A protein has these predicted regions:
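Primarily the internal scaffold of c-type cytochrome electron-transfer domains
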Residues: 2-362, 369-381
């Protein structure tokens, strides 16, 4: 708690100089002068000074997204082929920069801070401390859940809750809230299904769908192991599967392995390119960032990463599509799309459209199409 609440409101906050953990904590001669910043005016000072040796102090910067940039714009060292440090930095995650270039940034059409989305407000006025007993209530209290899209660590902790002396439902409640946040991050819409004749005597079902990003940053964002993908299935009038893209692989016991059938990265054959059109089950639309080392080789080891060879993560609404014509905040190279997505006219700020073409035989009289948008914290392998 005290680390974030000690970060000072300095000019570097939210800039290149203040990112990657380069925060400022003020010095003090008297321990009782050590400030702990919060959003409320006129805080009761003595209880915290006496019990924790911090002086609660009002400062609005703790409600500003720039505070989050301290850790959520993160660049890591780049090594040369000999394992030596270079002058370059790799943009491991640029969540704040993505937000700065979205409609959710300050002054944007949908302005909303990181804290407004990731720190749900308590209902009604609350007492933010049980001491002293005559403490008044405060409105608009931000609950410190920090819910995002990942339950991996929460699940590990939950499995060890007895050793951690944590109650049965605590981690479960956090995981439920996290999954609810993840559900709201994006949406998938089937826009059109139509039968076409690409050639005389041939029929195909054309499915056009759209994936929407409802977040103030890319989806997925942060650490590059994360990926999202489209699973689309089409069955005929008898329930026979005609086509399936994005199916999870299973082991001999029918248990999902985490690999996705048809995804090149999951077979060691490079990585799955971005698709504007999908015509076979061996093609899957995967939204992800793929790292490469200084020699251009694909890598999943962060400290080997020098740049991205693919970044088609869904863009937030308001994001600049063309840096030559659209205004960009900061360095375009830190947040740019990379690979085939750059050339896809349907890959735009806030959404992506994908077309599926499914061959039909003469015996097929009706088709049921289902599609869902899935997320993995850790890519297979």
């Amino acid at each position: 708690c005290t680390l974030c609440h000690q970060i000072a409101d300095v000019p570097e906050l939210g800039t290149d100089a203040g990112e990657s953990g380069h925060y400022t904590i003020e010095t003090f001669a008297d321990p009782f002068d050590r400030p702990a910043y919060g959003p409320y005016t006129n805080p009761r000072i003595n209880p915290m000074r006496i019990n924790a040796v911090f002086t609660p102090s009002h400062s609005a910067h703790v409600t500003d997204s720039a505070l989050c940039a301290t850790c959520h714009n993160l660049k890591t060292p780049v090594l040369n082929a000999g394992g030596e440090l270079t002058a370059d930095k790799f943009p491991e995650q640029m969540v704040y920069a993505e937000w700065e270039n979205s409609a959710f940034a300050d002054g944007g059409a949908e302005a909303s801070s990181c804290q407004q989305c990731h720190m749900a407000r308590a209902e009604g006025p609350v007492k933010i401390s049980n001491r002293p007993r005559n403490l008044g209530t405060r409105d608009n209290f931000a609950r410190h859940g920090f819910y995002g899209g990942n339950t991996l660590i929460l699940d590990i902790l939950d499995k060890n809750r007895a050793e951690l002396e944590v109650g049965d439902g605590d981690f479960a409640a956090a995981m439920e809230a996290t999954r609810a946040t993840l559900q709201s991050a994006a949406a998938l819409v089937i826009e059109e299904t139509v039968v076409e004749e690409p050639a005389p005597g041939e029929r195909e079902l054309v499915v056009r769908l759209r994936v929407e990003n409802n977040s103030g940053h890319k989806v997925p964002t942060s650490y590059p192991s994360r990926r999202a993908y489209i699973h689309l299935a089409a069955a005929d009038q008898d329930g026979t599967m005609l086509f399936e893209s994005g199916r999870l692989a299973t082991d001999a016991n029918g248990k999902p392995t985490g690999a996705i059938v048809g995804v090149d990265a999951d077979t060691g054959a490079g990585f799955e390119t971005h698709h504007g059109e999908i015509t076979s089950e061996g093609q899957v639309q995967v939204y992800e960032a793929i790292m490469e080392d200084i020699s251009g080789n694909q890598t999943y080891t962060l400290l080997n990463a020098a740049r991205y060879s693919k970044d088609n993560r869904l863009l937030p609404r308001g994001f600049p599509r063309d840096p030559q014509t659209d205004p960009v905040v900061g360095k375009w190279s830190d947040i740019a799309m990379v690979g085939e997505a750059e050339l896809d006219a349907d890959f735009v700020a806030g959404s992506d459209r994908v077309t599926y073409r499914i061959p039909l035989d003469a015996a097929t009289t009706s088709v049921t199409v289902t599609a869902d948008f899935n997320y993995q914290t850790m890519a297979y392998g």
